[in-house]
Amino acid sequence: MAAQMREPKVVVLGGGSWGTTVASICARRGPTLQWVRSRETADDINENHRNSRYLGNDVVLSDTLRATTDFCEAANTADVVVTGVPSHGFRGVLTELARELRPWVPVVSLVKGLEQGTNMRMSQIVEEVLPGHPAGILAGPNIAREVAEGYAAAAVLAMPDQHLATRLSGLFRTRRFRVYTTDDVVGAEMAGALKNVFAIAVGMGYSLGIALVIARALREMTKLGVAMGGSPDTFPGLAGLGDLIVTCTSQRSRNRHVGEQLGAGKPIDEIIASMNQVAEGVKAASVIMEFGLTMPIAREVDAVINHGSTVEQAYRGLIAEVPGHEVHGSGF
């Protein structure tokens, strides 16, 4: 009788809300280890099956999920790595990982952002720091707390190798969490980074209708994403429009919260200091403008966050745009 293949061990790097949620999902499918920096968080996960700091006391995690603060243990035992650390710490963690990780282990990013200074996507950083390791991204319209509470949701796993993507998608799939696949890594990553900036714009409000901002934001997202090599078919899907809608409308959206606080007149440094999680749109706003395309919504968000503009000035800047062709025009 042939020996049964063992389940691959998933190692999730990062102890935030989405990393923990994905780790708990994976633990229901097979052996999963979560690396966190905080001993308190590790103990909470191991002893109470909770991550109270990021998901509150009501969300109960899989009782088979185990957490560790030992990075070497995590890296040395991984068959699949899932990275949930913020974009500003992503490269540093991968550099540590490169010293310990076995060859060819796939690396799937949960991060929806771009690296400041290089403008690189997370999968590009994986390819640079961990050559030979298949890189992918799990993207889609997911608010961590809602998925952790069991609401039905979906995501797309983007990898160049669709055979591998199909195999790995089963590690994340449950009855209530649907996982599709695509080979458009560029489109999925660009959509994930861009939607955070547009959610800040929605949060700022100032008499701009949500439907108007979302519709025009989708045009800007598609424009830059396609220019970077993404497929136009990706942006009306889960990683694009789906994630854009949920991030712009959910009361649990961190990036929308930043926009609301900006609209209330608070300075960006004060807003960031008051949050215990990262809003990737704050960093992505300046990176997006470096690509040099005409993107009025992103331009005004960047002006408010990084150049001292007010929300009222941002509103006036958008309203001053002359409407042109809905699809081919470059204005708002």
Curated annotation (Swiss-Prot):
Disulfide cysteine pairs (residue numbers): none
Any one GO molecular-function label of the UniProt entry: NAD binding
Catalytic function, reaction form: sn-glycerol 3-phosphate + NAD(+) = dihydroxyacetone phosphate + NADH + H(+); sn-glycerol 3-phosphate + NADP(+) = dihydroxyacetone phosphate + NADPH + H(+)
Pathway: Membrane lipid metabolism; glycerophospholipid metabolism
GO-annotated biological processes: carbohydrate metabolic process; glycerol-3-phosphate biosynthetic process; glycerol-3-phosphate catabolic process; glycerophospholipid metabolic process; phospholipid biosynthetic process
Binding site for sn-glycerol 3-phosphate: 112, 140, 195, 243, 253-255
Primary enzyme class: oxidoreductase
Pfam families to which the protein is assigned, alphabetical: NAD_Gly3P_dh_C, NAD_Gly3P_dh_N
Active site: 195 (proton acceptor)
Alphabetical UniProt keywords: Cytoplasm, Lipid biosynthesis, Lipid metabolism, NAD, NADP, Nucleotide-binding, Oxidoreductase, Phospholipid biosynthesis, Phospholipid metabolism
Superkingdom, natural source: Bacteria
GO cellular component: cytosol
Similarity section: Belongs to the NAD-dependent glycerol-3-phosphate dehydrogenase family.
HAMAP family, sorted: NAD_Glyc3P_dehydrog
PANTHER family assigned to the protein according to its UniProt record, in alphabetical order: GLYCEROL-3-PHOSPHATE DEHYDROGENASE, GLYCEROL-3-PHOSPHATE DEHYDROGENASE [NAD(+)] 2, CHLOROPLASTIC
Protein name, per record: Glycerol-3-phosphate dehydrogenase [NAD(P)+] 2
